[in-house]
Amino acid sequence: MDKQTIFYCYRMTHDYGINPCVFTENYDTTPHLLTEGGCMLQLRRNIKKNWADKINSKSVDAYIMAVAGHSNDGKKWRDDQGMFITPKYNHLIFVAKISEILTMKEYLLSPKSNNRRDAYTYQWLIEKYGLNQSSFMKEIVILADRFNYFGKSP
């Protein structure tokens, strides 16, 4: 039997420093973690319920495709360190092959989270709000070994 391929498609409309739809100052793509932004909440829930085991066992190939939307959160185009810029146009398409699905706890205990900005943010949230024993630690984290943007850069 042929290997099944699944695609998740959506429109990214917000960029946070740990959202995949982000660029360095030179418009290079940045993170390999695909998990942030409310637009991915339903996507993560569906993957967890229906596909996580199959993705991790490599019995399906899973991809995420998104159109990068215009965003200007809080009238800021960069974070406090000036490291990230939101896309200025709706001309970029983001595509990633999902390589692994982990729980938040598994991710934070794995070497994949070492020295990553998102991991520091998660640790801060966990400590600040006492989330160690909460359902937050069971939320899934979607990892991708590679991804690309297609289209016009701002």
Could you tell me what each predicted segment is?
Residues 12-14, 66, 98:
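Hydrophobic side chains in beta-strands
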Residues 86:
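Amphipathic helical hotspot of TIR/SEFIR-family domains
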Residues 17-19, 73-74, 101-106:
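Eukaryotic short linear interaction motifs
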Residues 99-154:
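Aromatic- and Lys/Arg-enriched surface recognition patch
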Residues 76-83, 91-101:
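Short beta-strand-centered aromatic/proline hotspots
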Residues 8, 62, 94:
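Residue-level detector of short, conserved catalytic/binding motifs and their immediate flanks
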Residues 52-83:
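Short coil-to-beta transition motif at edge beta-strands of beta-rich domains
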Residues 1-59:
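Compositionally biased, charged N-terminal/linker segments
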